[in-house]
Design a protein with these regions (language model features):
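Feature recognizes metal-dependent phosphohydrolase scaffolds
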Residues: 1-427
Length: 427
């Protein structure tokens, strides 16, 4: 989700539509309006006019909704549908613009029979749960209407010139990376794309193939290009499109699924169509040879190195363990997000790394302050000790410690050069 906000802050249309839609989906539009001061009135006005006779029943917000404010809920649903349709349109334009992304299977609006209210996928016809598409021209389904274009231009402007948002995004670019090697551990969000046989999958970017660490590096370079490039607009545009690629493409190490079934989840009943097949990585991450291959690719010692993996929620309530491959890999899931707590059964993990070793702390969900006070409960956490060292780790054993030792060695060499007269003193 970070990369989506980063793309949105650069002014990328598809990323902006996704950000606004997800905020509407989880009843978080106040984050945009009150938190960042982003004006959503043009979108609200358009949604009220365009969908005034549409109940938009498929677009209820998830999570906590203030049912006492019915008018606000109705507006949220209309805004939600309006931005979702705009998203499918601008994403379709992007997919057509970038055939090298290999995402033609996500062009869905042209597969709809708007008279019958059905869609044909892989030769099979499915009925749509919502058949009202007043802004879609069947002859040119990916074209924005004049009103949608106005709303889109407005959103691009307010996202690009929101000072508070830009400050946060510059912080992410300054401090963040797609992966990080730290104190013998490799941290990444999603996966390292693999082939069916467990080897690194090659992904073509701008005519050249990349795999493993190189794929991470080129995608990060292009994402930064999409945000910071000011002179070469062609390069900037490609970098912006790459941020959306990172968000949703099956070859993205951050996403790691065959498709993002957003359209299917809204409009279709068939459960199989909603499934998002995971990358082969998830079939291999219990295999020590594959994990060692990944550790070596990123320059870590296979005997002591660890991988800290995010992205995939761990279904603790079903008995799933966050510790994989005999303790070489740990999955830290998104359980702090309420949306995932029904899946996981907990409120996420914290990985603690200190001089004593490694331990995982699993947290119970926090319901509300009222519940805590009324039931006199506390937030409990269960600790799992992963490995306990016999000798405590010292500062000199860490990455920072090694950097300090290198500085000390440099200073000693400098002192020696002065003492030998190799460097003359300035008087």
């Amino acid at each position: 989700h970070d990369i989506l906000w980063m793309g949105a802050a650069s002014g990328h249309r598809a990323c902006i539509c996704n950000v606004v839609r997800i905020c509407a989906r989880y009843n978080n539009l106040d984050v945009l309006e009150n938190g960042y001061g982003i004006n959503l009135i043009p979108l609200a006005r358009f949604a009220l006019e365009c969908y005034k006779d549409d109940e938009c029943e498929l677009f209820h917000a998830s999570g906590e909704v203030d049912e006492s404010n019915i008018r606000e809920e109705e507006l949220n649903k209309k805004m939600h549908k309006a931005i979702a349709i705009m998203q499918f349109k601008v994403e379709g334009q992007l997919i057509k613009r970038r055939p090298d992304f290999l995402m033609d299977q996500r062009l869905l609006l042209d597969k709809i029979d708007y008279e019958k209210g059905t869609i044909t996928l892989d030769g099979k016809e499915y009925e749509l749960k919502d058949k009202n598409f007043p802004t879609i021209d069947p002859n040119d389904p990916y074209k924005l209407t004049k009103e949608e274009e106005y709303v889109m231009e407005h959103l691009v402007t307010v996202f690009k010139y929101c000072a508070y948002l830009q400050e946060h995004i510059r912080f992410l670019f300054a401090k963040g990376h797609l992966y990080k090697v730290f104190n013998g551990m490799l941290l990444y969000h999603g996966c390292v794309p693999l082939n069916e046989d467990g080897t690194f999958r090659e992904v073509e970017i701008e005519g050249r193939k990349y795999a493993g660490k190189e794929l991470y590096d080129v995608l990060e370079h292009l994402a930064r290009q999409g945000y910071y490039e000011e002179k070469d607009m062609k390069s900037r545009k490609y970098g912006q499109d790459i941020m959306w690629f990172i968000w949703s493409n099956e070859n993205s190490p951050v996403y790691g699924k065959a498709k993002m079934a957003t359209f299917e989840r809204y409009f279709l009943d068939d459960a199989d169509l909603k499934k998002e097949k995971k990358d082969y990585y998830y079939q291999w991450y219990e295999n020590e040879a594959v994990i060692n291959q990944i550790l070596e690719e990123f320059g870590l010692d296979t005997s002591t190195g660890k991988i800290v993996n995010g992205h995939m929620p761990v279904a603790v309530k079903k008995g799933e363990s966050p510790i994989k491959c005999g303790g070489k890999l740990f999955v830290i899931d998104g359980g702090f997000s309420k949306a995932y707590q029904k899946t996981t059964g907990i409120a996420g993990y914290t990985l603690v790394s200190n001089s004593y070793g490694l331990k995982l702390v699993a947290h119970e969900p926090f319901v509300s302050r009222t519940t805590v006070i009324r039931e006199e409960t506390d937030i409990h956490s269960d600790t799992i000790v992963i490995n306990k060292v016999t000798k405590r780790k010292c500062v000199m054993d860490t990455d920072n410690g090694k950097a300090l030792q290198e500085k000390v060695a440099d200073l000693k060499q400098l002192l020696w050069a002065y003492q030998k007269g190799l460097i003359t003193e300035r008087i």
